[in-house]
């Protein structure tokens, strides 16, 4: 059995900064979305993805991959959004077993109402606090990590 490669001081500082910042930012985002529209962050991300998709619709499997959710977690979120009238399900014309999530007009209006406040929070606590160079470095580092995580599944 190999000994674990413990984190040195620099690595530990980076890890702790990432974890605490992620949780604090996520909390601010959740507070803003809940106050503005009663949405959770995952629900908001679903609305964003659907708004950008052709005809405001996506296959559930593709949507789960995009929002990094398990199929059961996505199904739960879609059910909540459906109850709120923001999303509906439709059968996939090219695959009878496939299910599409479709953004409703009410869902689009909700997104248009909530998005400015969401961007404000993201800017205030992350984007506007970093230089362009820091943003590029962060993007490069996070994409490397994301690729490793996605390819290990």
Task: Identify the residue ranges that each predicted region occupies.
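C-terminal regulatory/oligomerization modules of transcriptional regulators
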Residues: 1-9, 132-153
């Amino acid at each position: 059995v190999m000994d674990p490669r413990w984190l040195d001081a620099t690595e530990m500082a980076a890890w702790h900064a990432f974890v605490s910042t992620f949780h604090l930012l996520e909390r601010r985002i959740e507070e803003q979305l809940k106050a503005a529209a009663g949405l959770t962050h995952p629900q908001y991300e679903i609305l964003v993805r659907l708004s950008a998709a052709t005809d405001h619709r996506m296959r559930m499997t593709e949507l789960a991959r995009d929002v990094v959710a398990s199929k059961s977690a996505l199904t739960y979120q879609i059910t909540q959004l459906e109850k709120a009238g923001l999303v509906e399900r439709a059968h996939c014309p090219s695959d009878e077993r496939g299910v599409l999530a479709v953004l409703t007009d009410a869902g689009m209006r909700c997104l248009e109402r909530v998005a400015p406040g969401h961007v404000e929070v993201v800017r205030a606590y992350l984007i506007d606090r970093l230089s362009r160079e820091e943003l590029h470095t962060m993007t490069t580092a996070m994409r490397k990590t994301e690729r490793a995580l996605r390819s290990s599944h």
